[in-house]
Curated annotation (Swiss-Prot):
Function: Activates expression of the rhaSR operon in response to L-rhamnose.
Organism from which the protein derives: Enterobacter sp. (strain 638)
Site-annotated residues for Interaction with sigma-70: E246
Ranges annotated as DNA-binding: 196-217, 244-267
GN (gene name): rhaR
UniProt protein name: HTH-type transcriptional activator RhaR
Primary location class: cytoplasm
Protein keywords: Activator, Cytoplasm, DNA-binding, Repeat, Rhamnose metabolism, Transcription, Transcription regulation
Length: 282
């Protein structure tokens, strides 16, 4: 595999004193694998796509949040009306006396989890902050740099308050119905999920929820769950020695032959071929 593209500071920051900036992706197009000379926060507003981070695939949609380190390699593929924002920053340029490491996973090392979910309430809280931050980052004076860093501190603290682990059902009991559904789907990789039962439990209209989900994500509920399972299968095939039948079971497929058919249709190759190619590429 060739050396990935490196995104340079000089192409994204107005001057050497600027610590934070906003890079919109309206919408995000397919983007080849790359690393950076800076770090970034990625927040997805709507649509869907495949985000491959350090060789691990994630099917992303509304509310997905990533903390990307400079040395991380990632790419975007199979995008469908994917709207996201990148808040980019240079750790060495931050001047505020803030405990950045406690607010930004992986700030000092690779141990922090890169992938989180942000609640609908949290998305509403951070959107105006990002808008303000973007406005300040476009100004060419020192006070604007200082204001942008203050807003960045507010942003990362707000994200910490409202984020939750992708499959943690207890973290968003008071949150919007769509958040609950996406969390429930992420927690159903290895077992069946029945939307009708979910709607009975939440006392909501199944038809209305299906429509809301499709409007916000660009996918049906079943398609999204299938994509989550295929992404998990790709990870297991590359990083474990599990047999294909075992991978199928762990990804919610009782029939390994059916799993292979679905995998081939979604990925363009069989599970065995994927395992061989992904390991060779790594």
């Amino acid at each position: 595999m060739g050396v990935p593209l490196i995104l340079r500071k000089t192409d994204f920051f107005a001057n050497a004193g600027q610590a934070v900036a906003v890079a919109d992706r309206y919408p995000q197009n397919v983007f080849a694998e790359h690393t950076h000379e800076f770090c970034e926060l990625v927040l997805v507003w709507r649509g869907n796509g495949l985000h491959v981070l350090n060789d691990r695939p994630y099917r992303i949609t509304r509310g997905d949040l990533f903390y990307i380190r400079a040395e991380d390699k990632h790419s975007y593929a199979s995008v469908n009306d994917l709207v996201l924002q990148n808040v980019i920053y240079c750790p060495d340029r931050l001047k505020l006396n803030v405990d950045w490491a406690s607010n930004i996973p992986g700030f000092n090392d690779a141990r922090g989890a890169p992938h989180w979910r942000l609640s609908s309430n949290g998305m509403g809280q951070v959107r105006p902050v990002i808008t303000q931050l973007e406005q300040e980052s476009l100004k060419a004076d020192q006070s604007a740099n200082e204001m942008a860093e203050l807003l960045f501190a507010q942003l990362v603290m707000t994200l910490k308050r409202f984020r939750y682990a992708t499959d943690n059902p207890s973290a968003n009991e008071q949150e919007a119905l769509l958040d609950k559904l996406i969390t429930a789907l992420a927690g159903s990789l290895n077992r069946s999920f029945v939307l009708e039962k979910f709607c009975e439990q939440e006392q909501c209209s199944e038809r209305a929820l299906r429509q809301q989900f499709r409007t916000q994500t660009g996918m049906t509920v079943n398609h999204y769950l299938r994509q989550l399972r295929i992404c998990h299968a790709q990870y297991l095939l590359q990083h474990t020695e599990l047999m294909v039948s075992e991978v199928a079971m762990r990804c919610g497929f009782e029939d390994s032959n059916y799993f292979s058919v679905v995998f081939n249709r979604e990925v363009g190759m069989t599970p065995v071929q994927w395992r061989h190619r992904s390991r060779k590429a790594a």
